[in-house]
């Protein structure tokens, strides 16, 4: 019997991609991104898979997962049917995790459904999470150079840490490598290095996080019930809890290559990279 679940956030709209990129095949055997999350987390000891989806494609997701992974312990949670006013845009990553509360009764790893994190990352986070106390959160930190696209700029959560303890997570926009080969950012403006640690939204939590999320979601909803785009976001929640002294975040360095797609033009490079890694 294992002591770990994987929670995969697959309800985002992917507006810049122009479609449901969570269901686009990227792997050499017809895998979508979250197939690798399922396989790699199971290899790290997870025995429950929780997929957070929208109702409109829940059946399609379940059919795909069963065809690829067989009779695993699979739970689908529809974020758009969970404790929130109806609107087109999902209510954010922290709300997605709260929506999964009824399906999670053990420590769990959280990932995006449309990112590839590498086999090693799941084992590293799982190992740290098993040793973590109730008030400790685990955050995988990737080397910035391993997360940059060949073209264009991106946003990343830049980690500042004291040893392995996170002190600040700064959402940094307009990150790109300039013509001199230097990594620069637009907001806040600055220079970064290849080895700058960044968050790609891979977390490890214990179930005690749900008590905090329920309280903070109620407060958030009181203030933003009628908004169409304001989101209840996981990094903001974690930062608030850190500031209040209610939890500590342990940063786990990961040397794996991250692979993702933002625009349709990113698909072919992602497929080529995954073919090299997973064939």
Where are the regions that the model predicts?
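A short acidic, often aromatic-flanked loop/helix-cap motif at beta-alpha or helix-coil junctions
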Residues: 81-86, 146-147, 175-177, 258-259
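Active-site metal-binding loops of divalent metal-dependent hydrolases
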Residues: 13, 114-115, 144
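Conserved core of the sugar-phosphate nucleotidyltransferase
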Residues: 119-203, 207
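Conserved beta-strand termini and adjacent loop/short-helix elements that scaffold enzyme active sites
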Residues: 77-79, 99, 140, 172, ...
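Short glycine-enriched, charge-decorated loop/helix-capping segments at active-site entrances
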Residues: 21-26, 86-87, 154
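Conserved N-terminal catalytic core of the sugar/cofactor nucleotidyltransferase
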Residues: 1-8, 28-110, 117, 122-124, ...
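Conserved alpha/beta core of the MobA/IspD/sugar-nucleotide pyrophosphorylase nucleotidyltransferase superfamily
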Residues: 162-163, 177-279
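N-terminal nucleotide-binding beta1-loop-alpha1 segment
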Residues: 1-20, 24
């Amino acid at each position: 019997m294992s002591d770990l679940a994987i929670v995969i956030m697959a309800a985002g709209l992917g507006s810049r991609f122009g479609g449901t990129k969570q269901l686009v095949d990227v792997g050499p055997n017809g895998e979508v991104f979250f197939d690798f999350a399922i396989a790699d987390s199971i290899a790290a000891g997870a025995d429950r898979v929780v997929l957070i989806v929208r109702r409109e494609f829940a059946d399609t997701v379940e059919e795909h997962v069963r065809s690829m992974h067989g009779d695993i312990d699979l739970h689908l949670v529809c974020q758009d049917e969970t404790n929130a006013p109806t609107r087109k845009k999902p209510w954010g990553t922290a709300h997605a995790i709260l929506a999964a509360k009824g399906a999670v009764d053990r420590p769990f790893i959280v990932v995006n459904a449309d990112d590839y994190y590498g086999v090693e990352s799941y084992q590293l986070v799982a190992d740290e999470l098993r040793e973590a106390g109730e008030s400790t959160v685990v955050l995988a930190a990737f080397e910035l150079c391993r997360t940059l696209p060949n073209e264009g700029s991106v946003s990343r959560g830049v980690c500042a840490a004291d040893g392995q303890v996170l002190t600040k997570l700064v959402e940094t926009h307009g990150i790109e490598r300039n013509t001199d080969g230097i990594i620069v950012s637009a907001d806040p403006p600055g220079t970064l290095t290849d080895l700058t640690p960044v968050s790609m939204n891979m977390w490890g939590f214990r179930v005690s996080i749900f008590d905090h999320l329920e309280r903070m979601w109620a407060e958030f909803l009181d203030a933003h019930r009628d908004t169409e785009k304001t989101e209840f976001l996981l990094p903001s929640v974690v930062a608030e809890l850190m500031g209040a002294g209610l939890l500590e975040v342990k940063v786990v360095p990961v040397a794996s290559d991250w692979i993702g797609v933002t625009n349709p033009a990113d698909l072919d490079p992602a497929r080529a990279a995954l073919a090299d890694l997973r064939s």
